[in-house]
Amino acid sequence: MPRALIPPSNPIWPDGNRCAVALAFDVDGPTGDAMLDGSLLHNFRYFSEGAYGPWRALPRLLDLLADYGLKATFFVPTWVVQHWTDRCEKILGGGHEIAYHGHRHEVFMDCSPQRQLEIMMVSREIFQSRLGVTPVGFRTPSGDWSEETANLLADFGVIYSSSMRGDDRPYFHLRGDGSRALVEIPARPDIDDYTALAYFEDPDFPAGLDRISDYRLVEQNWCREFQGYYRDGLCWTTILHPKVVAKPGRLGILEGLFKDIRRHENVWIAHCAEVADWWTAQDKIVEG
């Protein structure tokens, strides 16, 4: 089993801030299972539902983040970078971070280590050639990875992951010899918009979901989640998708959430990479 270093109970954040907020969005577009199994080629409506994310929803989301002076991390499959390069350039132009999320949203848990490395190499080349950046962060597509993935990512130059769910503070994945592999910034499914807002008739995804939650209740739930992390001094990140949450009617949910974050004092708004750098630096201070 992969090993992890248990984090301190009471994290310390820069400049005396009470908690950390690392907003994160997955710009999946039409990538994912239907692209991987080939069915997307024969389902143009489903393709258009995914394409709506980078084409229409992403610019709207970037404008809202700018309105509230918030920065975020965007995990982007590089197939999306290839097909909507200009939209991805606007992410960087807005002062946000871009990070790895597979090429076509592959299921890393089902990929051999060699295949995982191939995907990372393809992704890096596309990020460098299209956007002139080399990401340092990773969120596993489809939510899980194999036992070898953490070490593979660290050897590839990745410094953090936001893939696991088992804590509300950053922690370190450990190598077999006990040394640090990379920082984990865990995100909880409580703040995954698919849980409350995603509904596709065909294919049936998420399976069995036959309703959309009341937007007012979704906003209240997400604000409560943030408030709990603020109260306890933790690190709050999100699993949100422009194609799901950044539609005209739903943008009010995000606006209510952003207002609530801004109403609270001593909140460190950070890229995930900044959280990882801080966590690593604090660990070195403790060791020293």
What kind of region is each of these model predictions?
Residues 48, 135, 201-214, 241-243:
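Surface-exposed cleft-lining segments at the edges of enzyme active sites
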